[in-house]
């Protein structure tokens, strides 16, 4: 698919997104302003999103909420004049840091340690010791390169961005005995 769309003049943005050169997504990628949220790639960084329908997700500031997954529960809340929020969570400092890191990987294909260290007041190698250990097999497979300055996703790795990013998602690393959760970092 990538080869055919590229041959037709489309630019590969990431995962399942393509755009024509000059399109807002292509321009944002070229200028380093591309952003990703739970709906996909976008040019709108850090804007609040309000979900209205069944199972929809809202993102306001450092909080996420989700409406009920079933229509009857959603309708009952609406009929009673209530917001149909089923569950929600607030991001802590670790969530914000990991979201920043994963955003850099998914949108730009690289992470510069010094930039994250400065923005979040951490020592990258110490903070992400376990995560970097999980990344080692992907380095060995040629999907990501690690240097003293940072991480760079290879052209092969771009096809497996979710797997690379998952190394840094603490919610995906929870023991299997705990209930599965959607990633708060992506």
PLM region descriptions:
Residues 84, 110-111, 144, 173-177:
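Intrinsically disordered or highly flexible coil/loop and linker segments, enriched in small
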Residues 1-125, 185-186:
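C-terminal scaffold of the Radical SAM
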Residues 139-149:
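A short, conserved structural fragment
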Residues 156-186:
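Short, amphipathic alpha-helical interaction segments positioned at domain boundaries
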Residues 24-28, 137, 159:
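Short secondary-structure transition/capping segments
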Residues 124-139:
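Short amphipathic alpha-helical interaction segments
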Residues 150-154:
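Minor-groove-contacting beta-hairpin "wing" of winged helix-turn-helix DNA-binding domains
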